[in-house]
Amino acid sequence: MRLVFAGTPAVALPSLRALIDSPRHEVVAVVTRPDRPAGRGRKIKPPPVHLLADEAGIPVLSPERPRDPDFLAALTDLAPDCCPVVAYGALLPREALAIPRHGWVNLHFSLLPAYRGAAPVQRTVLAGDDLTGASVFQIEPAMDSGPVFGVVTERVRPTDTSGDLLDRLADSGAHLLAAVMDGIDDGTLQAVPQPAEGVSFAPKLTAQDALIDWTLPAVAVDRLTRAAAPAPGAWTVFRDRRIKIGPVRLGAQNVPDELAPGRLVALADGAVAVGTGTAPVLLDEVRPEGRGPMKAADWARGARLTDDDLLHAPAERVSAAGSPAGAGGAP
């Protein structure tokens, strides 16, 4: 088939490579988001999919809006049989959906109808699910609601970050997407409507969502730090400045009894423990505001922790007794 592939970030690269390498299909063009500032220098850079298309000698379309008349005309001239999509990053108008003979087919990183939306992998890790997967479905105007051509399942490991899990799903999903293209091409594959039961949604994980509440159980803190890695990054406040917290570890040993939520202690072996609403957790990596990632033990030595130090939410003052200042008392 003649394919026009739509995708933008690195997670789409395995799928694009699989389709480029397929002897049964020809990727005649790639649609991606326009070049944007990236990195610490905020230099204008093409997205990863654009770079791979350039390497492969494939024409690239980068419309500001997919409903732009020039883009719709160019897509019509390409006469695609099907348009596979992986993390393109923009809503497709009805006019675009009607152009390919077999429509637009999307790789989504959940077992639909669960976790429709922008952040299925992050929400999977945050919920503590032990099974997830990827689905390939026909795009319809309603978000992630179209009939499904096929799925692949993936176990969620106890230490998975969102990045870890997404990398595996990107690889297994690429094989699934290529197989679906084959099935559509030879007419052996029909999409099945999604069930009405089990629908859930996965909105983007914001910076506010990634703020750690140290009064929550240790398992909830663990899930949040893994769900927010690598982005947007779980965070808290230390000495009036933000600090990002990498994935924590459960099962801290030899920690003082009843370590209050947010309280820090440097252990004899160099580890750094933090109190939560249940058991303490161990910090492995932190990123102080304005600095790069560093080992928690090195950060703690440099910070010279005191008994009064606390990780907390913004603008939360803490009394010497360990409770928020003013809590339960008269103003």
Swiss-Prot record:
It is an enzyme of class 2 (transferase). It catalyses: L-methionyl-tRNA(fMet) + (6R)-10-formyltetrahydrofolate = N-formyl-L-methionyl-tRNA(fMet) + (6S)-5,6,7,8-tetrahydrofolate + H(+). Gene3D superfamilies: 3.40.50.12230. One of its GO terms (cellular component) is cytosol. Attaches a formyl group to the free amino group of methionyl-tRNA(fMet). The formyl group appears to play a dual role in the initiator identity of N-formylmethionyl-tRNA by promoting its recognition by IF2 and preventing the misappropriation of this tRNA by the elongation apparatus. NCBIfam families: fmt. This is Methionyl-tRNA formyltransferase. The lineage of its organism: Bacteria, Bacillati, Actinomycetota, Actinomycetes, Frankiales. The gene is fmt.
